[in-house]
C-alpha cells in the first residue's frame, strides 16, 4: 500500500518501476516464497514474489502506472463491467483492497485513478461480469523484467531464495479463502539462483499427482502439466525470460539434506 520508492530502470516493456526504498537500501535479502497458483502468472514463486513484492503499488506522481499496475495491465487497463451478467452480489466491492469499487443505484462505479489493477474483483466475480484486459505473454515478461530491476539494486551473491512447496494452493495467497492443496507437500528448496530454484520447483510440481477434492482432482491422470491445466497461463515464459535476462540458469542439481 506504500509509495516510498525509488524509480529503477527495468526493461523494454516496463521501462522504469518503483522499487520499494527499503529493499533498494538494504545490502542483502532472503526471499521466502510460498509456491502456489496465480490468476495471471499461472505459477507464483520467487520471480513473482520479487517482482510484485519488491515494488510499490503506486508512485507519488505517476500512480499505479509506475507500480504494480504497470505489470497487471496493458494500455489503460480499464475495468469492464457487463451489466447483464451482474447479479449485484457485491463480492467485488467487498474484496477491493483500496475500496475503490461502489454500486450506486445498482450501477457499477470505481475510482479509476486510485485502482492499482490487481484483478481481485474480476477473479471473485461468480458470473464473469467484471473483466480486466491483459496480455499473458507481456505480463510474464514484465514479471521477469521487474524482478531484474529489484535484484539490480543488490551486489552479486547478496540474495538467497527459499521456496516452500507446501500447502500448494490453486490461487494466490492474497485471495480471501484457502482451498484444498492441489498436490502433496514437496519440501523446501534453497538456492542463490532464482532461475534454477524456479525451474526445480516447477519440475517437482509437474511430477506430483493431483490431490482428491482439490481444484485439480478432476484432472486426474489426464494431466502432465497441472500448472497450465489449472490456469491456462503460459507460466514458463517468466522463467525463460528471467534466464534470457541473465538472472540465472535453468540447469540445476538437486542435493537432499
Please describe what each predicted stretch is.
Residues 1-257:
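Extended, low-polarity segments enriched in aliphatic/aromatic residues
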Amino acid at each position: 500500500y506504500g509509495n516510498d520508492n525509488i524509480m529503477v530502470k527495468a526493461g523494454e516493456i516496463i521501462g522504469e518501476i518503483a522499487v520499494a526504498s527499503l529493499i533498494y537500501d538494504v545490502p542483502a535479502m532472503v526471499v521466502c516464497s510460498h509456491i502456489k497458483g496465480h490468476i495471471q502468472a499461472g505459477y507464483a514463486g520467487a520471480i513473482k514474489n520479487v517482482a510484485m513484492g519488491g515494488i510499490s503499488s503506486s508512485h507519488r506522481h505517476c500512480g499505479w502506472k509506475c507500480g504494480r499496475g504497470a505489470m497487471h495491465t496493458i494500455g489503460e487497463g480499464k475495468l469492464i463491467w457487463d451489466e447483464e451478467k451482474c447479479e449485484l452480489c457485491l463480492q467485488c466491492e467487498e474484496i477491493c483492497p483500496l475500496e475503490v469499487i461502489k454500486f450506486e443505484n445498482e450501477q457499477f462505479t470505481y475510482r479509476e485513478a486510485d485502482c492499482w489493477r490487481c484483478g481481485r474483483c474480476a477473479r471473485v466475480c461468480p458470473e464473469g461480469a467484471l473483466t480486466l484486459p491483459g496480455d499473458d505473454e507481456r505480463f510474464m515478461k514484465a514479471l521477469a523484467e521487474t524482478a531484474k530491476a529489484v535484484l539490480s539494486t543488490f551486489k552479486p551473491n547478496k540474495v538467497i531464495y527459499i521456496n516452500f512447496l507446501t500447502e500448494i494452493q490453486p490461487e494466490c495467497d492474497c485471495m480471501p479463502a484457502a482451498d484444498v492443496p492441489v498436490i502433496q507437500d514437496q519440501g523446501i528448496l534453497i538456492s542463490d539462483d532464482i532461475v534454477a530454484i524456479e525451474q526445480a520447483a516447477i519440475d517437482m510440481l509437474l511430477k506430483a499427482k493431483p490431490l482428491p477434492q482439490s481444484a485439480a482432482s478432476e484432472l486426474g491422470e489426464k494431466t502432465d502439466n497441472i500448472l497450465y491445466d489449472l490456469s491456462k497461463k503460459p507460466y514458463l515464459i517468466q522463467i525463460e525470460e528471467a534466464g534470457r535476462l541473465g538472472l540465472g540458469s535453468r540447469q540445476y542439481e538437486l542435493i537432499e539434506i
